[in-house]
Amino acid sequence: MTVATIGVRAGTLGVLASLLTSAAGAQQPTFTPDHADGIYKLGERIGWTATLPQGATAKGAYTYTIRRFGVDSIGSGTLSFANGRARIETSLPEPAMLVVEVKPPAGVTDFGNQSTGGKGRIRLGAAVEPTKLVASEPKPTDFDAFWAEKLRRLAAVPVNAVVKSGESDRPAVEWSTIRLDNIDSSHVYGQLARPAGDGKFPAVLQLQWASPPYPLQKSWVTSLAAEGYLALNIEPHDVPADMPQAFYDALPAIIKRYNTIGTLSRDESYFLRMYLGAYRAVEYLASRPDWDGRTIVVMGTSMGGQQSFVAAGLNPRVTHLIVNVPAGADVTAPLHRRWASYPNWNVSNPRVLETARYFDPANFASHISARSLVGLGFIDDVSAPAGVWSVFNQITGPKEVVPMPDSPHNHLATAAQQRPIVKRTAEWLDAIVHGRDPFAPAPAPRVIFFDDFTGGTLDRSKWTVRTTGRTVNEEQQAYVDDTATIRVVKGPQAGGTNGALLIRGRSRPGHVTPEGNRFDFVSGRMDSRGKVEFTYGTAAARMRLPAGTGLWPAFWLLGAGRWPDVGEIDVMENVGDSSWVSAAVHGPGYSGDTPLVKRDTFPAGQDITGWHVYAVDWRPDAMVFRVDDREIYRVTKAMVAPYGRWAFDNPKFLIVNLALGGGYPRGVNGTKAPYVGLPGSTVQLIQHDGASVLVDWIRVTQEDVR
């Protein structure tokens, strides 16, 4: 496959639709760029439209300054509003980054905040032909020789790995602390996690931001191990990774100013040990027998991103690089009228300048051949975007940039501003762990089943309506094949759709089943057994559920044969609490009261009575449950292993039903009378036809699973 060497993804995702709203609220303008991705061609008009809220007027003069590379002013002015709108415009004949700083009228104190560039101002960012930006100075002539000698010196130090197993915070994941020896009697401390059991796994190394010192969180590595990675997360400092916070607070103050240590000598720089530690961590992962022998991902943010650039530049074993707002890029930039980047070395001092050039990621970049994903913010004055572009542009392997024109540094940004790189990182990690090329377009899913219930009656070629003659799960209803309980509806009954499946629980005291058993309620259940069965894929249903304590609607998948050996996937269940739904899996050793279950609470303002899409992505090694495309739970093969056999490689069929009461509702609501799990208030609801499930559609899709 041929993969383009550069890809640009705009950081829109709703961030730029209303853009750059100040913290001031209703009377302040919003700013919308002419180009959503903030990227322009040489000589092209660069512009933003400022818009006041409807009916508002400017209470004084809004002024702005346009700065090339965030430093030199190339224009300024006052916003001139007409019909509630004003323009900021400029152009540039050469590649550059631009920062516009907007200030409010005198007396306005609630304008701007950290996420817009600082209190009392709003920053706007733009890039002009950024893929042509280069580092401000060439690398030293002996740069490669210097680092080759340091790697030889490191190779002479035995690794002496000390791995101590500890308690994991996730099922089916093994967790350990680790210590490796480094140069000058220093160490690399970290945490290691892997899927439990035998196997060989792709590796990922996480590199951290560095100030102030802090303990590493277990979940940072165990979450990756739960996805199928051999994961290592290391401290940037020569300190243990899992001590109480008080330990880090008591460290010498100089460590909090680590960027000032050894700045006058390349052989004494604090970053020498840090960079070699990252290199050693990569080599250690490659030496482990549980590494898959193919894939090593290095990833980090801010100072972690700086280290990641270096690790990928020094070590060709790195196959994938993922960085966000990386620090330290093009440290000589201030000498050339560009924004500086942390570590903010005083490069006006000749000795500091000489040292800094050996630790600048821009000088490692041409050696990076890994597939690379780089995120950067256009108004980031911690990790200056021009420097990040200058590194990105030198990477020789396939690469992708995620520009975020409205984002400052990650610790100041909003979740919405950082969402583009967070989303793309998740997509990359998912592709890599499943052996896919992250640059390859996702295969279009193939629809293997669909029913939108628009016919006049239920399509019996797809569905069988089931009847029951005995009590199961202590449920209080009998399932009957009756249009009173299950049918296709149109018009107002369909809840605004062009047709829907209606399943309704009804009061029918003294109902006798063919087997002679008595029930006071009837309801509907249908399945696709023997008509539509599939192995792996995405099963989804758009549904609207009733709120009533003890009502038990469900959308689930089941294999043919003896339960629980055949495996059960509960895509959605609810027992009457309108604020949440649950997802679960059942199999041999983890059935009934399964430990593999998760409740998910709806966002504010939503509940089960609205239309929602409930889905499961069923894969050979995992199941991902979603509500409205939002992941709510993930069950992996490794999570199942401690409880029993994985029972999810066999065909499954679809089931939709509405139970009334039963063991699960009773376990939640504690009701035993008048019916198990079903209180009197819900009995009245059923008697007044208030217990109904609507299903707009059910769909199953499949794609290439590798």
Where would I find each of the regions flagged by the language model?
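Short beta-strand/loop motif that positions the catalytic acidic residue
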Residues: 368, 374-376
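Gly/Ser-rich "nucleophile elbow"/oxyanion-hole loop immediately N-terminal to the catalytic nucleophile
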Residues: 257-302
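Hydrolase active-site cap/lid region
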Residues: 305-351, 403, 413
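GH16 jelly-roll
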Residues: 441-706
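Short beta-strand element of the alpha/beta-hydrolase
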Residues: 200-209
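Cap/lid segment of the alpha/beta-hydrolase catalytic domain
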Residues: 210-276, 330-341
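N-terminal cap/lid segment of alpha/beta-hydrolase-fold proteins
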Residues: 34, 38, 155-198
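C-terminal catalytic histidine-bearing segment of alpha/beta-hydrolase fold enzymes
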Residues: 347, 390-441
